């Protein structure tokens, strides 16, 4: 039987959770999950022991999602961002897979009904991404202010709405769409690269042309996709050779565009050549 819990000054482990773990400490290896879950449980000394959410929808965002966020940031400091990309990709895959087996309903993160794949996998992705968009110091400042306000609170207890309001206060107007996409709705992307071309320049650098598509859509609690028709905020694209148009929720999004290479001496080692956010306003970009 797996066991993992936390008490004041104590984090008990069962053997299945950590003691028989085989950790690959190499640069190409994965993250030390025993270390990760230990950090998660220690983080509960703040998120669940000091900040106690009311027994309503979204309460596990305050405990589990924020403990996951703390774990990610500690892992990032110890292992670097390269390994974080592996962890985040796995979390995304687990979220997308798990939601296909939902038998009840999937709510937005701040109204989640206690499903693990939402408050763990999706929650960790959202808070980590938010720290990347608005800045880690900015997000942590909002979290610190929130903790000071509600720590050891007597009933009525705090809710996810209160936390999201604190985050709104520090989010710039240009990124307000993130609050709706990340917390208030179920928002997904259908992004893909259509074509790439590269040319070596005389100075030894490369010019890279990328044609890509960015499309954003929402899901209701039963998994039905819609593209903003309920709010009349959708956009479309249709080329001459397309039988049907493609749709997207109205775009004003900052999307990461990256180019990665392999180390000449170590083909398994990934090298970041370019990574920058670009503001996207339409579906197709060349």
Predicted regions and their residues:
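Beta-strand-rich binding/interaction modules
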Residues: 176, 188-282
């Amino acid at each position: 039987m797996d066991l993992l819990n936390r008490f004041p000054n104590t984090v008990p482990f069962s053997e299945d959770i950590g003691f028989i773990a085989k950790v690959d400490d190499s640069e190409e290896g994965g993250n030390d999950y025993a270390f990760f879950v230990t950090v998660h449980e220690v983080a509960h000394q703040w998120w669940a022991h000091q900040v106690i959410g009311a027994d309503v929808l979204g309460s596990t965002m305050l405990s589990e999602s924020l403990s996951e966020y703390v774990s990610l940031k500690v892992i990032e400091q110890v292992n670097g961002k390269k390994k974080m990309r592996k962890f985040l990709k796995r979390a995304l895959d687990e979220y997308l897979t798990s939601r296909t087996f939902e038998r009840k309903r999937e709510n937005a993160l701040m109204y989640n009904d206690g499903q693990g794949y939402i408050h763990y996998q999706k929650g960790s992705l959202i808070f980590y991404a938010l720290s990347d968009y608005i800045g880690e110091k900015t997000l942590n400042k909002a979290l610190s202010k929130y903790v000071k306000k509600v720590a050891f609170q007597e009933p009525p207890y705090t809710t996810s709405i209160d936390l999201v309001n604190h985050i709104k206060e520090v989010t710039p107007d240009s990124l307000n769409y993130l609050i709706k996409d990340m917390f208030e709705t179920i928002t997904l992307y259908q992004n893909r690269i259509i074509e790439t071309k590269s040319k070596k320049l005389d100075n030894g650098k490369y010019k890279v042309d990328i044609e890509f598509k960015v499309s954003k859509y929402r899901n209701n609690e039963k998994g039905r996709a819609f593209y903003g028709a309920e709010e009349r905020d959708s956009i479309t694209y249709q080329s001459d050779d397309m039988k049907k148009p493609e749709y997207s929720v109205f775009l004003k999004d900052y999307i990461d565009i990256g180019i990665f290479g392999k180390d000449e001496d170590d083909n398994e080692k990934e090298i970041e050549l370019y990574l920058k956010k670009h503001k996207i306003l339409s579906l197709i970009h060349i």
